[in-house]
């Protein structure tokens, strides 16, 4: 028996009380509850937490739940909150004369789910570290998905960051350094190349 991620559910014969044949499948009555994979996967906090709606929208739009829900693989997932996505320096703008910063927003009132996430765009002074002029908005779902894909790919590690090493490679190929894992929220730090160069780890 496979679950909604097409992984074996691990249902033992002893757990099956009754079986019915339907016109399009089989119904098993079990004497225990099996959780949907989305409730036990690494993306679960983003699904239920209102402060993480933006990233969960990206997970659904990009269909990342297909493999994040897989119980045959192990992932470490660092989930940015909505507030942290107000300071995303657009890597596409690095080749421009003016670096730009995206501030992502979530609008739950939008009937069209594809339009619920949008971004205001600002000029950003990389030397002073200051946000300057507002230069417009991005409401094209394709561009928003593109930027969120970059964020997701740099926040997913295939493997366990609690295995005793310090350096890991993200799904997007970026190297990160993880320290003080055993301290959890009280002291664990994560650094990409920018944080390492600036001596400013994220905790």
Annotate each language-model stretch with its function.
Residues 1-203:
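Mature, structured domains of secreted/extracytosolic soluble proteins
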